[in-house]
């Protein structure tokens, strides 16, 4: 760069810094190199599938899928993980369906959880913005986007047409929220439902409510749905297997999958999850129904193996460390096990 251009650029940078503050513009090579700050999901398998070790802070995350698929359970587990690390969490309950007893069983400290049950979509999103602007909240969950009803629709009559109101509301709110969340380092998790598009013959007929804005602004999108048969002990169903697909990821390669086991009444079992991941990584050997770690037999059946590890925390951490060393062997690309 010649001298005149260099001086002009330096003067422009000084003017910008004076007007907008230090750091408003900087050379990429001078920017501090930082690892992405994350909140663990409570599942090692999902943390590995995300590629960064959890849900990114300062970003928007969308968790969507069919009903009773484990979306709210996953979001509450993330809240529990944030609280366990001394963080503050908020739950915007637009569906008015939060069960405090279930949240407590998942490990959420309900006495410290900030909860709002807003009357309109505008009120819900303003609350999210104000909480994020405070800089004191680590994670905010909105349950759900489909329940963020614009005020005009609530005040109107049944049967009135309100085309595009919710999509415009979301678009306007997310434009403001993106910068606020980045500055406050707050993770915002939007839970969403799925709908069927009418008249779609080819391709995926599913779509999510709230327009396209959330798809664009979300750094991570997780598709959560049941997979296979329920988990049974004898003839009794005790839980469900859930497959989480990372549909979008701006921070690591997307299209990875994780299979979680959600048990009725207690949610994710992190030790059973570790056993699954350790088997996939070759750290724990499975022969028939027996699970072994090196020369040590852990037990017959996953429940017995998990129970043995709960009694030996030092062994649990040793296995976790070995799994993380072999994390590239654990992550399964979408469709890899389906013959695609």
From Swiss-Prot:
One of its GO terms (biological process) is DNA recombination. Transmembrane segments: none annotated. It is found in: Cytoplasm. It comes from the Bacteria. GO terms for molecular function: ATP binding; ATP hydrolysis activity; ATP-dependent DNA damage sensor activity; damaged DNA binding; single-stranded DNA binding. The keyword Transport does not apply. ATP binds at residues 65-72. One of its GO terms (cellular component) is cytosol. The keyword Transcription regulation does not apply. Keywords: ATP-binding, Cytoplasm, DNA damage, DNA recombination, DNA repair, DNA-binding, Nucleotide-binding, SOS response. Belongs to the RecA family. Can catalyze the hydrolysis of ATP in the presence of single-stranded DNA, the ATP-dependent uptake of single-stranded DNA by duplex DNA, and the ATP-dependent hybridization of homologous single-stranded DNAs. It interacts with LexA causing its activation and leading to its autocatalytic cleavage. This is Protein RecA. It comes from Thermus thermophilus. The gene is recA.
């Amino acid at each position: 760069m010649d001298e005149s251009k260099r001086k002009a650029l330096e003067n422009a940078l000084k003017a910008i810094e004076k007007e907008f503050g230090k750091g408003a513009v900087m050379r990429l090579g001078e920017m501090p190199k930082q690892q992405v700050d994350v909140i663990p999901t409570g599942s090692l398998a999902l943390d590995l599938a995300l590629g960064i070790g959890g849900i990114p802070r300062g970003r928007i995350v969308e968790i969507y899928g069919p009903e009773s698929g484990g979306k709210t359970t996953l979001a509450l587990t993330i809240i529990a993980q944030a609280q366990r690390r001394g963080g503050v969490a908020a739950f915007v309950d637009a569906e008015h369906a939060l069960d405090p007893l279930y949240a407590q069983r998942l490990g959420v400290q309900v006495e410290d959880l900030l909860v709002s049950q807003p009357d309109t979509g505008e009120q819900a999103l303003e609350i999210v913005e104000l909480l994020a602007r405070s800089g004191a909240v680590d994670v905010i969950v909105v349950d759900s986007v489909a329940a963020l009803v614009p005020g005009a629709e609530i005040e109107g009559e049944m049967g009135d047409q309100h085309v595009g109101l919710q999509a415009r509301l979301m678009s306007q709110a997310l434009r403001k929220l993106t910068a606020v969340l980045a500055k406050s380092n707050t993770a915002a998790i939007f839970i969403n439902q799925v709908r069927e598009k009418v008249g779609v013959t080819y391709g995926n007929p599913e779509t999510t409510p709230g327009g396209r804005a959330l798809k664009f602004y979300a750094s991570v999108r997780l598709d959560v749905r049941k997979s296979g048969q329920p988990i049974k002990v004898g003839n009794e169903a005790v839980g469900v297997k859930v497959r989480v697909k990372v549909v979008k990821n701006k921070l690591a390669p997307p299209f990875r999958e994780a299979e979680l086991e959600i048990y009725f009444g207690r949610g994710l079992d992190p030790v059973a999850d570790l056993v699954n991941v350790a088997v996939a990584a070759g750290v724990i050997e499975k022969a028939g129904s027996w699970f072994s770690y090196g020369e040590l037999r852990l037990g017959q059946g996953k429940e017995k193996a998990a129970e043995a590890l709960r009694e030996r925390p030092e062994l649990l951490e040793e296995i976790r460390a070995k799994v993380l060393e072999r994390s590239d062997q654990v992550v399964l690309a979408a469709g890899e096990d389906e013959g695609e």
